[in-house]
Amino acid sequence: MGLLSAVFGTYSEREVKRIRPIVSKINELDEVMQKLSDDELKAKTVEFKERLNNGETVDDILPEAFAVVREASKRVLNMKHYDEQLIGGVVLHQGRIAEMKTGEGKTLVATLPAYLNGLTGKGVHIITVNDYLAKRDAEQMGELYGFLGLTTGVIVHELTNEQRREAYNSDITYGTNNEFGFDYLRDNMVIYKEERVQRKLNFTIVDEVDSILIDEARTPLIISGQGEKSTEFYKVADYFVKTLVKEKDYTIDEKANAVMLTDEGFHKAEQTFKVENYADAENVELQHYVTQALKANYAMRRDKDYMVKDGEVIIVDEFTGRLMEGRRYSDGLHQAIEAKENVKIARESKTLATITFQNYFRMYEKLSGMTGTALTEENEFREIYGLDVIVVPTHKPVVRIDNPDLVFKSEKGKIMAVVDEIAKAHEVGQPVLVGTVSIEKSELISSMLKKKGVPHQVLNAKFHEQEAEIITHAGEKGMVTIATNMAGRGTDIKLGEGVLEIGGLKIIGTERHESRRIDNQLRGRSGRQGDSGESTFFISLEDDLMRIFGSEKIQGVVEKLGLEEDEAIESKLVSKSIENAQKKVEGNNFDIRKTLLGYDDVMNKQREVIYKQRSEVLEGEDVKEEILHMLRDVISDAVNTHIKEDAEDYRESFLYLISYLNDICIPTNEVNLPALADMSKEEIVDHLYDVAVKSYENKEAEFTPERLREIERVVLLRSVDTKWMDHINNMDNLKQGIGLRAFKQVDPVQAYQMEGSAMFEEMIDSIKNETVKMLFHVKVERAPERVRVAQETNAVHGDKPSAPVGPVRNLNKFGRNDVCPCGSGKKFKNCCGREA
C-alpha cells in the first residue's frame, strides 16, 4: 500500500488533483468579478436563481458562484478565499468531509457551498459545536450572505417557535446539532402542522464533524416526560452496594467500564432482598437498581465523570472537560449517583421521542463536514455515513516540531516534569498550552504552578464566550493556559508579537487520549498557517491508557532501566505500543457504535413509519379510507382468532366473536347469528364489515362528514402518539435485556430485530383496535379535540450505553384527578385516562 501511494499518490491527493481544474476556472473569473460594481455583483444572485429555474444545475454554476462569493468576501469581510479554501469548498459541495488543519479558515470555506446550495431555496444548515460559535459565525458570515441577497438565521436554545420557524425559513441557518435534532423530534410531536418549525432536511455542513458524528454518535437525543417510579429503591440499592467488598463480592472490568457481582455477591443480594434466585428473570428490576448502584459507586468517579455543585450532580464531558449543565445520565444511572452522593434524587423520566445523531444526519439529502482531524476515522465515516475524507493541502507547509513522547515511571514524576517544563518555557516568554484529560488534572497542575509563582489561566470551560476569549490570547508572549483537551475548539490561537522568534506556541499533552484524533487536535492548536511551534506528550505508566491497554513489555523495559521517579525515556517501542493501544480502543469503540446502529436501525425504520403516518394526518389528508381499512383488519383478526375450523361448537365461537366486536364496532342485535353458520370465514368478514360500515355511516350523519373527518384525525393522532410512546419504552426495555442472549449463542442484534418487529406489529394492531373503538363510541356532546398526550419537561442528549446522556426534555402528564382535556368535564381518570 505504501509503495502504491508513493507512485500514484494517496486517495486524497488524487481527488484534489481532480478538483484543481475547477479551481483554475474560478481563478480565471477573478478579474471579471473585480470589475463588477457592488450592484452588478449582487445581481448575480438573481441571475443564478433564474438559471437554476431554467434547468441548469448547481454544478453548472459552481465556478461562477464561487468566484462571486470570493469577490464579495473580499469587499465585505476583507478576506479573500485562497486556492486551498476553494478546494475545501468544492469538497463540501460534493457531500464529503474536508480535513483542514487548524487556522486554515474553515468558517470562511463553508460560505462557498452554503451560498451555492442556498440559491436553490431549499435551505442549508451549518452545524457548530456550541451556541456561541453558531451566533458568532452567523453574525460574521451573515454580512456576506446579506450583501449577496441571501438570508441568514441562527437557532439557539432560548428562541420561541415563531423565531425558530423564521430561522429555518432562511436560506442559510446556523445552530448546534442538539438544537436541530430536538426540533426534528418536536416537529414530530405537534398536533397541528402549523406548529412545525423545520423544513425538509436538504443540505448540511457539519463543523468539527468528528466530534459530532463520532464522539457523540452513541449519545441519543431524548425528549422525555415524568416517570412514575419511586426513587426509594435507589437509596436501598446504594446502601446495599456500600456494604460489599471488592474482589470478594464484586469485580471491576475497567476495559468495559463495568462492575459485576461475584457468586458471593449474588448470595448477599439474595439474603438482603429476600429473593430465592437473584439472577431470575422476575428480579430484573432489582438487578437494574443494583447494577446502576454498583456502577455509580465503583466505576463513576467524582470530579472526573461528574461534579457535585449546589446539591446537584452535573456530568463532565469526557472529551472537552466541560460541565454539561442540564444533561442527565439515562437508564437510572444519574439517580444512582444522586443516591451515592446523598443529594436529592430526581425521578426517572419516560421517553416520548428519541433519535441518535447517526440517524438524524443520515436523513439529509446531502451531508458534508469539516474538521482538522478525520483521517484516522475514515473507515467509520465511509461505512456509517457514506462519506469520503479528503485531506485538503495547507496554504503554507506545517513546520511545527512534534517531539517523541516522554515516558515516566509514575504519575507524580510526570506531573513534576510537566510543571518544570512549563516554568522553563515561561522564563523565556514562550506561550504554553497544556492539554489535560480531566478537570482534576487541570487543578493539580494549576496548584503546583501557583507554588512556583507561574501566572496562568485555567480553562475548565463553563462559559463558551469566556473560553473563546482566553483561547484567543493563549498565543501571546508569556501566556500559560491549562485546558481540557478539546476546550476552545473553533477559536484560533494567533501568535503575539515576538513569539515566532522564540519557537511559537508550545503544546504539552499530559496524557495520551484513547483516541489518536484527540491527541492530533491538541497538537494542531500550534503551528497554524506555517507558524513555528512544538508539541510533546508526557506519559506515565500509571495513566489510564497505559494501565488498562498498555503492554507488559513496556513495564518490563522501564523496570530494567531502573528509572528514577523524575527520569524519562524516549523510545520508539513505547510510542509504537501506545499507538497500538489507541488503535485497539478506537477499533473497539467503532464496533460498539456499529452494533448500536444495528439496534437503532430497527427503531429508525419504525420511527419513519410512525412519523410518516402522523405527517399525513397533520397535513389534513382524508383518513376515512384508512379508518375503513383498519376496521376490516380489526374484524378479520377477530374472526380468525375466534372461529377455528376444527371447533366443535360453532355457536359458542360466534357468541364470543359478536360479544367481542360489540365492544368495538358492531352494534348490539344487528347480526343474525344462525346466518353466519353457513358462511366461510371470508364471507363472515365481509358481512360483519358491511354491518359496521352501515353503523359508521349513521355516525357520519349524526356528526356531519366534515366534523367526523376531523374527529378521525384527532383520534388516530392520539392513538398513534400514546402507543408509540409506550412502544419506545418497551423497545428500550427489550434492548436492556437482550444482551443476555449472547450467553445462549444467539446474536443479540438479530434477536432485537426479530422481537422488535413483532412488538411493532402488535403496536400497529393495538393502534387499529383503539382507533376503531374510540370512533365507534364517540358521542356528539363530548367529541374529542386535539390535545398533546404528554407535555415536554426535559430534552436530554441521551445516554451512550454506559456513557453520559445528552440533552433530555421532560413532559408532564395530566394528573389523574385533573379535568380531562377532551372537554367532557369529567376527571381525566374517569374519561380518556381510562383509555390511556
UniProtKB/Swiss-Prot annotation:
The lineage of its organism: Bacteria, Bacillati, Bacillota, Clostridia, Eubacteriales. It comes from Clostridium botulinum (strain Alaska E43 / Type E3). Its cofactor is Zn(2+). It catalyses: ATP + H2O + cellular proteinSide 1 = ADP + phosphate + cellular proteinSide 2. This is Protein translocase subunit SecA. It is found in: Cell membrane; Cytoplasm. It is an enzyme of class 7 (translocase). CDD domains: DEXDc_SecA, SF2_C_secA. Zn(2+) binds at C820, C822, C831, C832. One of its GO terms (cellular component) is cytosol. Keywords: ATP-binding, Cell membrane, Cytoplasm, Membrane, Metal-binding, Nucleotide-binding, Protein transport, Translocase, Translocation, Transport, Zinc. GO terms for biological process: intracellular protein transmembrane transport; protein import; protein targeting; protein transport by the Sec complex. May bind 1 zinc ion per subunit. Its EC number is 7.4.2.8. PROSITE patterns: SECA (PS01312), SECA_MOTOR_DEAD (PS51196). ATP binds at Q85, G103, E104, G105, K106, T107, D492. Its main location: membrane. It is a peripheral membrane protein. The keyword Transferase does not apply. Monomer and homodimer. Part of the essential Sec protein translocation apparatus which comprises SecA, SecYEG and auxiliary proteins SecDF. Other proteins may also be involved. Part of the Sec protein translocase complex. Interacts with the SecYEG preprotein conducting channel. Has a central role in coupling the hydrolysis of ATP to the transfer of proteins into and across the cell membrane, serving as an ATP-driven molecular motor driving the stepwise translocation of polypeptide chains across the membrane.
